[in-house]
Amino acid sequence: MKKILAFFLVFALAGAVFADEPSAEAKIAEFKGDAAVTFGVDLDTNRTGFKNEVGGSIKLNLLNGGDKSTTGDGIWGELKLKINAFTLQAKADKNVNLLTKIDDDDVKVEIDTAKIHIGPAYVGIKKGDLNYGSNFWYPNALNYKDGDDEYYNRTPSDKVKYDQGLVLGYEQKDLFKVETAFRSQKDTGKKLDKVEGVILPKDTEIKKGEYFKSVEGAHDNAKTDDVFDDAALVDPIPGKTDVKKLKATXAVFKRVMKDGDTNYWTDKYALGVYGEVKPIKDLRVAIGTAYVFGRLSGDKDVLKAVGDSDNRGDITFFTGAXYKLSLLEKFVVNPVVTYTLYADAKWNGANEKLXYPEXLKTSMLKTGVRFGWGEXKKSNSLLYDFXGKNTLVYDTNKEDKGDDKLLPGVSLFGAFDLVNKNIETKLPLMXTFYSGELVKGLNVAALVHANVAKDASEISRVVPGTVYAGRMTKAXYERLIGAKGLQIGLAASYDVKLNDITIVPAAAMLWTHGMLKGEADTRMTADEFKVEAKVDVKGVIQNTTLSVFWDEAAFGKGTSKEWTFGVKHDEQNYYTLKNGVFGLKAKIAL
C-alpha cells in the first residue's frame, strides 16, 4: 500500500507536465453492492439449507492510462511511453488493492516504441526475440483470448532466445514494411537460492543432478550424492537414458536456483528478416525467418564444448495472411491462416558438427475464419457463465487478458500438426457461435470442439504401471474427461417482457468425451453430461431479482471393453452421478 500511495503522489505532482497523456485524478468509477439469500435442496443427499451472500465494491481512479510520444520529421528519434490506468478497489470480502492488468503491487511505465527514423527508414533499439507473427490472431465468436494460450488464439514462430540488438527497417504506411534484425544473446548465470526437501512418490521419473539424498549434497551439488546414480533408489527405464524412476516413495532434496550476474558480451548472434505487405485494404500478408549463428569466436575445442547449447544452427520461419472483408454495414468475413516452422540443429559428437534431425521440431498450419455481425458489450458468454472457467476446452487456469467484448457471429478454427505423423492422432477443429442482437431478447452461445484425426486418441501414450495399463478407474475417467477431446456446449436465454416484469429463462448443456486407444483396436472411453437451468424474474419487487434454479447436475460413464495393453482385461465400467442442487434465490442489487 505504501508503494501505491507513493506512485499516486508522484503522478499527482506530475499532472501539470502531462497534458493529454497520463494524468492524475481522484474519481469514483464504480460503487455497487448486492445481497442475496438462497434456499437449496441437494438432490443427492436430500439435505436442505440457506446460503447468504453479500457483495460490494468501490473503484477509485487515481491515474488515467495513456501514452506520450516524441515527434519529428526527417531524421529523428521516436520514443513512446505507455502506462496502464491506476485504480484502487475495495470489496466486501477484500481490503483495498491495486486493480490493473499488471501482476503484483506495481505500476510500470512501458517503452512501447524506440526507433531512430531516417525518413521512411528506421533503426529500432528495443529488445525483442525473433518470434514473428505474434500479432496474427485467430478470430473467434466467443472471443476467449487468453494471454498465455497461443494454441487457439495465435501461433508466432518459436523463440530463439536472442533478444538484444537492433532492427533496421523501411516502412510505407498502409503499404508495406521490411525489417532486418541483428540480435545477440545475453548469458544470465544461475546461483543457489535455497535447498528444498520434497517427497516424491514411487515411479517418479527424475533426471541426473535433479535430486540429492541430503541437504549438504544438494547444497554442494555433490555428484556422489545424486539420487540418479544410486541403484538402490532408482531403476532404469527401457528405451530411456536421460531419466530413471524411483523404486519407492522417498524424501529427497533439490537445489532452487535464482538469476545471477548477466553478461551481455557473449559473441552469440542471430539474424532475422521480416516483411509485411498490404496489397489491398484490410489484407495483410507477412513472412519472417531467423537463423542462429551462435557463438562466433573461439577455437574448435571451445565451439565443441558449446555444442548446440546456444541454439546454434536453429532456423525459425513464419508466414501468415489475414483479411477483413466488410459486407453491408456491420457484417464481416475475417479469415486468418498461419504457418510456423522450427528446425532444431543438434550437435553430433561423433562427427563434431551440427546436424538436423529428420523431423522438424515445429511444423504447424493453423487457420480460422469468422462470419460476424457487429460487436457486443458483454465480456462473458452465457456458456462461460454457466459452465465456468476451467470446464470449457478453450480456456486455461490463467487470468483472461483478451478483449472485453464478445464478437457476434460464427467461427471455425483448425490446427494441423505436420511433424512426423502427429496429424494422424491430433487434428483439432473448433466451431463457435454467439447470437449477439440477431434476435431481440435472445442470447445464444455454442461451441463444438473435436479431434477429427484418423487415429484420434486424447492421451496418445500408455505407460505400463499407470492408471491406463489395467482397467477403467475413477482416476482414468477423470484424466480422459480432463483431456476434453470432444466437447459440445450450448447455452441460451430469452427475455420475456410482460409490462414492467421481465422473465428470463436460461439453460445450458455441456457434453465432454475422452478416448484412449489400446492394442488390437480396443479403447477406453469416458463421457460426461452437465446440465443447468434457471429462471430469473425481474420487476416484481424493485431492485430485486427472484430466481429458481437447478445447477451442478452431471452424469458420467467410463468404460473399457476388453481393454488390451500388454494383457487383455474384461469389460470395466465407472459411473458418476450428481443430481445437482435445486433452489430459490432472492438478490437485491444496487
Swiss-Prot record:
Transmembrane segments: none annotated. It comes from the Bacteria. The keyword Signal applies. It is a peripheral membrane protein. Major component of the outer membrane. It is found in: Cell outer membrane. Its main location: membrane. The keyword Transmembrane does not apply. Keywords: Cell outer membrane, Membrane, Signal. Residues 1-19 form the signal peptide. This is Major surface protein MspTL. GO terms for cellular component: cell outer membrane. The lineage of its organism: Bacteria, Pseudomonadati, Spirochaetota, Spirochaetia, Spirochaetales.
